Amino acid sequence: MEKNGNNRKLRVCVATCNRADYSKLAPIMFGIKTEPAFFELDVVVLGSHLIDDYGNTYRMIEQDDFDINTRLHTIVRGEDEAAMVESVGLALVKLPDVLNRLKPDIMIVHGDRFDALALATSAALMNIRILHIEGGEVSGTIDDSIRHAITKLAHYHVCCTRSAEQHLISMCEDHDRILLAGCPSYDKLLSAKNKDYMSIIRMWLGDDVKCKDYIVALQHPVTTDIKHSIKMFELTLDALISFNKRTLVLFPNIDAGSKEMVRVMRKKGIEHHPNFRAVKHVPFDQFIQLVAHAGCMIGNSSCGVREVGAFGTPVINLGTRQIGRETGENVLHVRDADTQDKILQALHLQFGKQYPCSKIYGDGNAVPRILKFLKSIDLQEPLQKKFCFPPVKENISQDIDHILETLSALAVDLGGTNLRVAIVSMKGEIVKKYTQFNPKTYEERISLILQMCVEAAAEAVKLNCRILGVGISTGGRVNPQEGVVLHSTKLIQEWNSVDLRTPLSDTLHLPVWVDNDGNCAAMAERKFGQGKGQENFVTLITGTGIGGGIIHQHELIHGSSFCAAELGHLVVSLDGPDCSCGSHGCIEAYASGMALQREAKKLHDEDLLLVEGMSVPKDEAVGALHLIQAAKLGNVKAQSILRTAGTALGLGVVNILHTMNPSLVILSGVLASHYIHIVKDVIRQQALSSVQDVDVVVSDLVDPALLGAASMVLDYTTRRIH
């Protein structure tokens, strides 16, 4: 059994309420069933599964060869708001006995139905861990309130899209308990191949129907605006009658307003109309084939904006029920849908088209990820949830440990030459610092980092410093969410696709944050330096290379692929010198320490570097500092090179001002003081007048990389953790 602290099988209770959530839960249930060494599965069926009017869909669960442990009749008929509330109450009355009998370790709940809210409430109050499937999504209806309420009750979260993951993080959920897996139903969608799909089409729509020459309609009531929902459904049916294509109409969900929608169908004779087939339920594997080969789908079901995109089938999304969801280009929104002509026009626009397949909601590998996630759950961990609230300015909870100890962070700086580890206090004081040469191989480097951090952590105890976590600054591109170095600079070898968080966290039993050196410098300025209290500013680091970080509205910008603030690679000349990145004309190719060293060597080789009062020992490499010294002593060529370098940096700053319009630019690093006056001159000459009042200053921080690494940890301690 995988390492998770458990010495027995995990008892998993899957509770399903209707046909839609079963389509998402079934792939997970099949996956659990295939691993009996790890899991025991109990299935609880309730809600509309057990209602004859909605097809008694519990039978399809039995046909899938699942043993239904418990059937709970929880639906109070009436299909109005009061009936929904009474149904939740009835479920809350019945569920405690079931859960006491089953004693599950974890309950899996899907989506945003009122039945699911009852399940999550019961499990939470009975101290049963909850895994919520498809949290974090936004539709634009009352479903959002229910979904987000379940999120607050749930201990673990499986989401389908990156934006849903970000919503969960914004809701202060613990990132370590969020899995971006994709939609489980996509595992079946993307592997569904049925050469005999025509027999399915004929079975549901008639023998004379051709592929791509029919419509699937699926519309549900919006419970916060039932009257408008009924009117829109009536207009939709009128438009479909007028469009005169064979149409499969599925009955709506058993929500408030559904009874009135069924009355509209019967009033218009839909169940007996030659062009319509009205059905209560279609098995999911057959439904997949029907929507995959339809001329279009119309309605307001989430299926239209989620699953159908996998086939590129045209979709007409009516009203506001799915207004907040991500959609592919196959979806045409008719948000008002207040006239028959408008809906009819949408049908003419969409019917029969074929769009590119969309995989916004999954890649077909959700279930393996979910099973791995389940196996990682440690039942010995405290049940109480932790919420990660945003920083609270200067508002740290006090206890006796806080008073007697110095709250501190371990900061790690991985440079091209040196590896440094420091104990940094809450006030930004470097209490103790360790420096070693950075090894050339991955194994030696990881080993040395661990050794130095363990040594520093032990020393922190002697110094009465309470270490709250580890922050790491490294060159290259970093995924800070995962703590992984994606691509490193050429100065640090064997440092691509490196997981830094896991080995340090496992060894030190502390939380670990990782970011690149440019971002760390910006965070150091935000917490300890001249950026403190500034809403928008940019930091430029002038060292061996050129880096930077951008703070916008007090937050660090990482970019969609963690490549924001590569300021050294802003191009300032079309025919400039080659850059280490493979391009040419970059700021770094002019103004970095490497660039100045290159120019210094050229002058030295031509005997044009040294002037009176200068000497370079034979065993000493010529570098940027020699060029600066020569310029100070009157070397005109050295002065010209520095002027060109400073101008290139200044042009880069002008581009930043025109793009970001920050109120402050901080120049950091050993070359900053040599460039600042030139940069200010370029701004006066080249920048728009509206941005020329920007403050450009030299950083007064001695170790921005270490302080920035520490700030990731120390900022975290100002959050409330419950």
Curated annotation (Swiss-Prot):
Phosphorylated. Phosphorylation by PKC activates the UDP-N-acetylglucosamine 2-epimerase activity. ADP binds at T417, N418, R420. It catalyses: UDP-N-acetyl-alpha-D-glucosamine + H2O = aldehydo-N-acetyl-D-mannosamine + UDP + H(+); an N-acyl-D-mannosamine + ATP = an N-acyl-D-mannosamine 6-phosphate + ADP + H(+). Disruption phenotype: Knockout of the gene is embryonic lethal. UDP binds at R19, S23, R113, H220, N253, V282, S301, S302, E307, R321. The UDP-N-acetylglucosamine 2-epimerase activity, in contrast to the N-acetylmannosamine kinase activity, exhibits allosteric regulation by cytidine monophosphate-N-acetylneuraminic acid (CMP-Neu5Ac), the end product of neuraminic acid biosynthesis. Moreover, the activity is contingent upon the oligomeric state of the enzyme. The monomeric form is inactive, while the dimeric form selectively catalyzes the phosphorylation of N-acetylmannosamine. The hexameric form, on the other hand, demonstrates full proficiency in both enzyme activities. An N-acyl-D-mannosamine binds at G476, R477, T489, N516, D517, E566, H569, E588. Mg(2+) binds at D413. Zn(2+) binds at H569, C579, C581, C586. Widely expressed. Highest expression in liver. Also found at high levels in lung, brain and kidney. CDD domains: ASKHA_NBD_ROK_GNE (cd24060), GTB_UDP-GlcNAc_2-Epimerase (cd03786). It is found in: Cytoplasm, Cytosol. One of its GO terms (cellular component) is cytosol. An N-acyl-D-mannosamine 6-phosphate binds at G416, G476, R477, T489, N516, D517, G545, H569, E588. Changing C563Y: Loss-of-function mutant resulting in impaired sialic acid biosynthesis. One of its GO terms (molecular function) is metal ion binding. Its EC number is 3.2.1.183, 2.7.1.60. In the N-terminal section; belongs to the UDP-N-acetylglucosamine 2-epimerase family. Bifunctional enzyme that possesses both UDP-N-acetylglucosamine 2-epimerase and N-acetylmannosamine kinase activities, and serves as the initiator of the biosynthetic pathway leading to the production of N-acetylneuraminic acid (NeuAc), a critical precursor in the synthesis of sialic acids. By catalyzing this pivotal and rate-limiting step in sialic acid biosynthesis, this enzyme assumes a pivotal role in governing the regulation of cell surface sialylation, playing a role in embryonic angiogenesis. This is Bifunctional UDP-N-acetylglucosamine 2-epimerase/N-acetylmannosamine kinase. It comes from Mus musculus (Mouse).
